[in-house]
């Protein structure tokens, strides 16, 4: 199983039914709509739009369980579904407000390796790829082999909590606060290049469409630039979450 928990405001039984029991109904979208004039809420990174993101969990799990306790409530509720046969909601025990999601990962098949999602390296990699710039820390219990202090030449497993995401994207920082070395280091880590970029463009646009952009022009073209397999496009993020790895429509071909 994979267990994900938070210490947020949680959900009541009715909210579980409305938000998780109804496909294509986005609780995040409704939350933003209802609080459109609240500046504090506007500053919260919420990206939900279409009400289907949660259901992607069934791509790797044959059963999903959500235990949630709303802030200020005395009772918690448990939502359980196997995807195809509807869902059940019942009262349960939970000490603190917040939500806890348990994914019962599918068995491996001839064509699909589901067990890889139970490996800490895979989870770490996915978080860094899609959620590295979410403003809240994503913490995971990580296991490491360390030398046994009592037995020479032997190792023991040590478990510690580690924050996986960096939280602050470079493009959201003020340009005046960023040194050239920071731009170069970010580029090298992000795009696996040993060389510094030839040029950096860091800009911010405000208006009907508001966005931050950080563009790097490399010293050398990609190795497959002249091949048919070359895929153009920029990485597109929304509130720190990677939406598209190669968005071809952000720039014209030239």
Where are these regions (language model features)?
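GHKL/Bergerat-fold ATPase module in large chromosome/replication-associated machines
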Residues: 46, 67-86, 106-254
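GHKL (Bergerat-fold) ATPase N-terminal catalytic module, capturing the glycine-rich phosphate-binding loop
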Residues: 1-117, 125
């Amino acid at each position: 199983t994979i267990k994900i928990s938070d210490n947020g405001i949680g959900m009541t039984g009715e909210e579980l039914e409305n938000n998780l029991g109804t496909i294509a109904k986005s609780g995040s979208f409704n939350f933003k709509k209802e609080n459109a004039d609240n500046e504090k809420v506007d500053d919260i990174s919420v990206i939900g739009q279409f009400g289907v993101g949660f259901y992607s969990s069934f791509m790797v799990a044959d059963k999903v369980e959500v235990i949630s306790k709303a802030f200020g409530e005395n009772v918690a509720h448990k939502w359980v579904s196997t995807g195809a046969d509807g869902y059940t909601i019942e009262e349960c025990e939970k000490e603190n407000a917040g939500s806890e999601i348990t994914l019962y990962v599918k068995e491996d098949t001839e064509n699909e390796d589901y067990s890889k999602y139970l490996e800490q390296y895979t989870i770490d990699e996915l978080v860094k790829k899609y959620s590295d710039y979410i403003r809240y820390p994503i913490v995971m219990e990580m296991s490491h082999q360390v030398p046994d202090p009592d037995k020479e030449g032997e190792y023991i497993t040590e478990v510690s909590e580690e924050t996986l995401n960096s939280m602050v994207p470079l493009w959201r920082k003020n340009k005046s606060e960023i040194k050239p070395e920071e731009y170069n280091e970010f580029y090298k880590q992000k795009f696996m290049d040993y060389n510094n970029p030839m040029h950096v463009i860091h800009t911010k646009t405000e208006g009907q469409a508001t966005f931050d952009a950080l563009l790097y022009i490399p010293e050398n073209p990609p190795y497959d630039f002249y091949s048919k397999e070359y895929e153009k496009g920029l990485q597109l993020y929304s509130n720190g979450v990677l939406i598209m790895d190669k968005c071809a429509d952000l720039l014209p071909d030239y």
